[in-house]
């Protein structure tokens, strides 16, 4: 599309239903008329007219990889996940439109941890009336069938204006007039939303969450306002059901309000995006200070831990929503904090559940204290990566790393097949990063060994588990410099295991000098038999 941003209805709907979409593409109409074929990759923001055979093949392989990853995680959709020591988790979804609800439940969400209601109010000249809002909230609650639903009240301000609100222009809208701070002035809009939310509670239990709260006075005001609206509805003989009131914890001052706030609230939800921004005093949209916005900062981790502990001590239910919840590397730290409800984009739900299954909560608590004791976020990252490798240990060699008798047309395809499989098997952060590391080594010298064998290899921090992969092709494959190969043995080693890398490489190179060893690798038809052979000969 030529127009549209991250918050437009079209973009949100496309994302919800898995439809690839690019915005801000100039001359897109001309391309659709003149190109016989268009290739669209919304992950990297790429639109290619008339792609050549090489690019088509690359995307064919990429699609196969994504399908394999989806198939791997599919069984988790119907399961509530627990850590290896039995701590159960609710993995929730963030949505912006009611129509998204059914889709996120189909993709494994245990509920909705954040329903942003701004889309009901924006891109229109008048605010939605009570009935329109009631229907939208009821639609989500019906789809939930009793699952947890948290609906956030209107989060509008100077940086997110609405046409029908006469808002002042502010030098720093992130610190200005927004969200709960506006409700007294625009009381009718606030009350209309409150009525619609409480009416919808008759359809199913609902958590009502208010953003940008900074003081106890605001909490007391909100409590009295919702109590008054509930009383008014009862006087009008309008049924209401189970509802709970909570706030977003995104202003650091709320840390010290939680004990008193428990007299007026039922739950809190940490909004890590804004909380990090306010705690570290940096505008995350400002390129000059963007580097300071870092939720891996040890002091921010300590803040998160303290918020969680204080909320739990006060008897408040607590959850997390924001980019941090969707970061797989942060999960062991979040588990260590004691958070058991995480809300994220639907695409992150399955990977999150997969990671949670292998974690031990007690060990995660120890990891958190170690991370908080680090000096930098880089040290935190290194600490977590080391922990994750230990938590989900994988042997260097396994039969799922062997791809036998494949039809492969190029060296590029061979390397992508092997590195993509490493991602499918959860041995690298991403296949693309592993592939890049392999090609960086290939640029130094060709890894063709002779005897129709190539040994591409790399050491990289993006390798989670050092691995030996094998590809056997049906027909000889050009490896460059006039050399053809039929057997590709790839070594991918974490950069902390350099000594192990060299030992395996040396043993393998020596063994490949022997024709009987090469013949066995070429002739054996069973992946298990080849795995046993390599394990024995390389002393793995």
Name each region found by the language model.
Residues 38, 214, 493-497:
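A generic structural motif
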Residues 8-9, 312, 457, 501:
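Histidine-centered active-site/metal-ligand motif
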Residues 1-109:
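Acidic, glycine-rich flexible loop/linker segments
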Residues 2-4, 25, 41-43, 50-52, ...:
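Fold-independent oxyanion-binding glycine-rich loops
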């Amino acid at each position: 599309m030529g127009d549209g941003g991250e918050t437009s209805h079209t973009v949100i709907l496309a994302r919800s239903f898995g439809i690839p979409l690019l915005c801000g593409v100039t001359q897109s109409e001309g391309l659709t008329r003149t190109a016989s074929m268009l290739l669209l990759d919304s992950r990297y923001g790429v639109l290619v007219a008339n792609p050549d055979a090489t690019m088509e093949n690359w995307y064919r392989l990429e699609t196969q990889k994504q399908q394999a990853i989806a198939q791997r995680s599919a069984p988790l959709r119907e399961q509530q996940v627990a850590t290896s020591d039995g701590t159960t988790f609710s993995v929730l979804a963030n949505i912006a439109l009611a129509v998204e609800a059914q889709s996120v439940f189909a993709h494994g969400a245990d509920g909705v941890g954040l329903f942003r209601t701004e889309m009901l109010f924006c891109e229109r000249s008048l605010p939605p009336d009570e009935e329109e809002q009631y229907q939208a909230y009821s639609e989500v609650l019906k789809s939930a069938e009793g699952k947890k639903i948290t609906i956030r009240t209107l989060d509008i301000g100077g940086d997110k204006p609405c046409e029908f609100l006469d808002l002042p222009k502010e030098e720093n809208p992130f610190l200005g007039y927004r969200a709960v701070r506006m409700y007294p002035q625009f009381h009718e809009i606030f009350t209309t939303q409150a009525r619609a939310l409480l009416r919808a509670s008759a359809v199913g239990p609902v958590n009502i969450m208010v953003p940008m709260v900074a003081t106890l006075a605001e909490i007391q005001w909100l409590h009295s306002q919702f109590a008054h609206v509930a009383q008014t509805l009862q006087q009008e003989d309008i049924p209401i059901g189970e509802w709970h009131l909570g706030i977003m914890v995104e202003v650091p001052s709320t840390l010290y309000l939680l004990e008193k706030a428990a007299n007026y609230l039922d739950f809190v939800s940490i909004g890590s995006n804004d909380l990090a921004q306010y705690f570290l005093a940096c505008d995350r949209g400002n390129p000059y200070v963007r580097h300071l916005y870092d939720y891996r900062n040890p002091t921010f981790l300590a803040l998160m831990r303290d918020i969680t502990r204080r909320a739990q001590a006060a008897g408040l239910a607590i959850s997390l929503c924001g980019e941090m919840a969707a970061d797989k590397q942060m999960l062991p730290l979040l588990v260590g904090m004691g958070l058991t409800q995480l809300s994220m984009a639907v695409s992150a739900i399955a990977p999150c559940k997969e990671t949670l299954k292998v974690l031990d909560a007690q060990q995660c608590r120890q990891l958190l204290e170690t991370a908080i004791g680090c000096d930098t976020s880089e040290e935190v990252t290194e600490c977590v990566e080391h922990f994750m490798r230990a938590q989900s240990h994988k042997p260097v060699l396994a039969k799922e790393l062997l791809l036998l008798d494949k039809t492969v047309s190029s060296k590029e395809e061979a390397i992508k097949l092997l590195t993509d499989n490493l991602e499918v098997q959860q041995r690298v952060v991403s296949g693309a990063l592993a592939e890049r590391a392999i090609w960086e080594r290939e640029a130094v010298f060709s890894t063709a060994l002779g005897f129709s064998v190539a040994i591409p290899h790399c050491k990289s921090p993006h390798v989670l588990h050092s691995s030996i992969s094998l590809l056997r092709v049906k027909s000889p494959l050009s490896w460059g410099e006039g050399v053809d190969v039929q057997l590709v043995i790839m070594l991918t080693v974490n950069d902390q295991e350099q000594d192990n890398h060299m030992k395996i490489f040396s043993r393998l190179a020596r063994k490949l000098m022997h024709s009987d060893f090469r013949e066995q690798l070429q002739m054996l038809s069973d992946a298990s038999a080849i795995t046993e052979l390599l394990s024995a000969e390389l002393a793995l």
